[in-house]
Amino acid sequence: MAEIAVEVVYALPERQALLRLSVPAGTSAREAVLLSGIAEAFPGLDVQGCPLGIFGKLLARPEERVLEAGERVEIYRPLIADPKEVRKQRAARARSEREGG
């Protein structure tokens, strides 16, 4: 069976990894992450359930998305803070600075 070249990437604030690998044609995004062995480098990473994307686009069903040659599978981390709450805090700070506080 033919093989295709893909990349699997994961990043923490202090450490990043980009793994290049060859996988059989027909491999899904989730399968590529499992085949990459990235979980060994990042203990605690839930490769079975973590959200995945390709070139910045979140995949709804990474188990079903068949990869094409040259694609980069990105492993996403959960958000640390609620984006709405962060915006509210930023707006409150800006308002307070404008009012001279």
From Swiss-Prot:
This is UPF0125 protein PA4766. It holds the Pfam family Ub-RnfH. Belongs to the UPF0125 (RnfH) family. HAMAP family: UPF0125_RnfH. InterPro entries: Mopterin_synth/thiamin_S_b, RnfH, RnfH_sf.
